[in-house]
Each structure stands twice: as structure tokens, then as C-alpha cells.
From Swiss-Prot:
It catalyses: a 1-acyl-sn-glycero-3-phosphocholine + H2O = sn-glycerol 3-phosphocholine + a fatty acid + H(+). The keyword Ion transport does not apply. NCBIfam families: PRK10749.1 (NF008019). InterPro entries: AB_hydrolase_fold, Hydrolase_4, MAG_DAG_Lipase. One of its GO terms (molecular function) is acyltransferase activity, transferring groups other than amino-acyl groups. It is found in: Cell inner membrane. Signal peptide: none annotated. One of its GO terms (biological process) is glycerophospholipid metabolic process. It is a peripheral membrane protein. The gene is pldB. This is Lysophospholipase L2. Keywords: Cell inner membrane, Cell membrane, Hydrolase, Lipid biosynthesis, Lipid metabolism, Membrane.
Length: 340
């Protein structure tokens, strides 16, 4: 186990050998399934389980992501003794789409994501044999998971958030953005169309990406979408942007309602989500008497948005922190709720 964690620090040195060997063998052990989400949308998920594991991590990905991208993270957690479940949110990955153009990143209500996660938890997570249940959520998945826990307090033993989407970086004054979004909301042709500056999925060169400094991981993730057109998602709709901004506001408004042990990891070189909202969330949790781990975000120095797909030096720091955090919340006692 300790060697496993040490390997995180040098994996990129032989990344191709790892992905084509041990990681491919591990991925073949997956069990893929689906459940019916809000409005009868099929929601896909994947699971990795072993009889001797008594803890589970539910991974809640970010916008456009599919569970196929999370094989490496699942491998690392599984080999430390965690079962792993990963959900593909509605409108992306292998789950059902909502609009005729499958590349459009869209949701009717942000709460639909939250309700899907609640149904998933009730059907797949809560009835399971595990002694401890954790969430590891990234970006949009962080907003979804946090809203879920605010509405269903006590169902999860601990949550780790990487670059959670509590606010979005929009390169215009907020009043102007709101005017545009409100106007688009009243005009369906624009409401359900690509937000300005975005469009259908296309492969972007590594040199201009703002997600990771790891060339190997970036190219591997790009290959998933290049090889399987069915999982491609492009830019968001105006309505998705509006719903997501409102969701971030809901997260902050309810920050004091949830006492779940929380670790919040922040990317120092963030370009996608608004780090100021992480700081505000932590302040609100502290004021409510439920401070996050350390009382503030754990800043991963030098990291772009996708912290767990970063270069080994940054990824290993984050992953060690997450695993150590989950291990600190592994005592047999506790008052976790069994109701969702």
C-alpha cells in the first residue's frame, strides 16, 4: 500500500506502460450499469468492488466529463482498499442527452443533477455493505454534491472537493453577464444554444489548455473523446450557465446547513472556477461552527483546474491529502443518517 502511494510521485516517468498494462487490466474489471433519473433520463455509472473492502468512495465528476476519464483515480483508490462508484451526470458521458445536439452542455434545472445523485445514493450507495461512505467531487460535481449534502445531512462520512464550482470565471462584468443570460432565458432559440464563445466539441492543443500541466494525462483524456464520439460534450448553453451561477449562490446560502467533514482543495493557477467563492464558503462554514478541514482551502501550488489530472508532483500532494483525510474519518463510531 505504501509503495502504491509512492508510485504516485513518479508515474509519469513510465505513464504509457502503466496505462497500457496495470490500468487497462484494472479497467476490464469494471461493472457498468444505469438507473433512471429525473424525467426518465438514463444515468450511467461504473463500479469497482472487492469483497474485503468496507469503505466506498463515490466520485462525482465535473462538466463534460465521463467516468472513463477517471480510471486512474479509481485504480489508486481501489488499491488502497476503497470500493469506487463513479456517476456520469445527465447530458454527458454515457448518460442520456437532453437536446437534439448531443454536444450541447445542458440541464433543465441544476437541481436535476442533485436529484439524480440522491436517487443514485438511495439505490446504489446506501444499501451497500460499506462501513464508511465518502464523496470525492470535482468542479460541477462539487456543487452537485454539496447541494446534495445540504439537503440530506449526515448521509456521508466525509467529502473531498477539488476545485468545486461555487462560482464561474466569466470574463465580463457580472451585471452584464446577468443581463445577457436573462435576455437569453426569454428567447428559447438562444436559451438552449451555445453560450457566446463556445461551440461543439473539438480537440484543443495541449499548449493552450488551462486544465492541466500534465501532457500525458491531457493527451490520454483527449483520446477518450476522440475515439468515442458518443461521450463528447462541447460548450454549455446559456441556460446551463444561468442555472450554474444560481447553484453556486445556493451553495453559499446553505453553507451553514451541513456539518459533513469537508476537505476543499483549490488550484493555485485556477482559470475556470472562482476561487474567491471557495474562500467565502469556508468563512461561512466556520461562522456556522462547521469549519472545513484546516479552516480554509488547501491550495495546490502551481495547479490548474483539474488537480487530480495534474503532473505527478501536484497530483500526489492532493491525493495524499484526500486519502489521509478519509483515513482520519474512519472511526467505527458515528451518527451518519441512513435516510435520503
Amino acid at each position: 500500500m505504501f509503495q502504491q502511494q509512492k508510485d504516485w510521485e513518479t508515474r509519469e516517468n513510465a505513464f504509457a506502460a502503466f496505462t497500457m498494462g496495470p490500468l487497462t487490466d484494472f479497467w476490464r474489471q469494471r461493472d457498468e450499469a444505469e438507473f433512471t433519473g429525473v424525467d426518465d433520463i438514463p444515468v450511467r455509472f461504473v463500479r469497482f468492488r472487492a469483497q474485503h473492502h468496507d469503505r466506498v468512495v463515490v466520485i462525482c465528476p465535473g462538466r463534460i466529463e465521463s467516468y472513463v476519464k477517471y480510471a486512474e483515480l479509481a485504480y489508486d483508490l481501489f488499491h488502497l482498499g476503497f470500493d469506487v462508484l463513479i456517476i456520469d451526470h445527465r447530458g454527458q458521458g454515457r448518460s442520456g442527452r437532453l437536446l437534439a445536439d448531443p454536444h450541447l452542455g445542458h440541464v433543465n434545472r441544476f437541481n436535476d443533477y442533485v436529484d439524480d445523485l440522491a436517487a443514485f445514493w438511495q439505490q446504489e450507495v446506501q444499501p451497500g455493505p460499506w462501513r464508511k461512505r465518502y464523496i470525492l467531487a470535482h468542479s460541477m460535481g462539487g456543487a452537485i454534491s454539496t447541494l446534495f449534502l445540504q439537503r440530506h445531512p449526515g448521509v456521508c462520512d466525509a467529502i473531498a472537493l477539488t476545485a468545486p464550482m461555487f462560482g464561474i470565471v466569466i470574463r465580463m462584468p457580472s451585471f452584464m453577464a446577468r443581463q445577457i443570460l436573462n435576455w437569453a432565458e426569454a428567447h428559447p432559440r438562444f436559451r438552449d444554444g451555445y453560450a457566446i464563445g463556445t461551440g461543439r466539441w473539438r480537440a484543443l492543443p495541449f499548449a493552450i489548455n488551462v486544465l492541466t500541466h500534465s501532457r500525458q494525462r491531457y493527451r490520454r483524456n483527449l483520446r477518450f473523446y476522440a475515439d468515442d464520439p458518443t461521450i463528447r460534450v462541447g460548450g454549455p448553453t446559456y441556460h446551463w450557465v444561468r442555472e450554474s451561477i444560481l447553484a453556486g449562490e445556493q451553495v453559499l446560502a446553505g453553507a451553514g446547513d451541513d456539518a459533513t467533514p469537508t476537505l476543499l482543495l483549490q488550484a493555485e493557477e485556477e482559470r475556470v472556477v472562482d476561487n474567491r467563492m471557495h474562500d467565502r464558503f469556508c468563512e461561512l462554514r466556520t461562522a456556522a461552527g462547521h469549519p472545513v478541514e484546516g479552516g480554509r482551502p488547501l491550495v495546490i501550488k502551481g495547479a490548474y483546474h483539474e488537480i487530480l489530472f495534474e503532473k505527478d508532483a501536484m497530483r500526489s500532494v492532493a491525493l495524499h491529502a484526500i486519502v489521509d483525510f478519509f483515513n482520519r474519518h474512519n472511526s467505527p463510531s458515528g451518527n451518519r443518517s441512513t435516510e435520503v
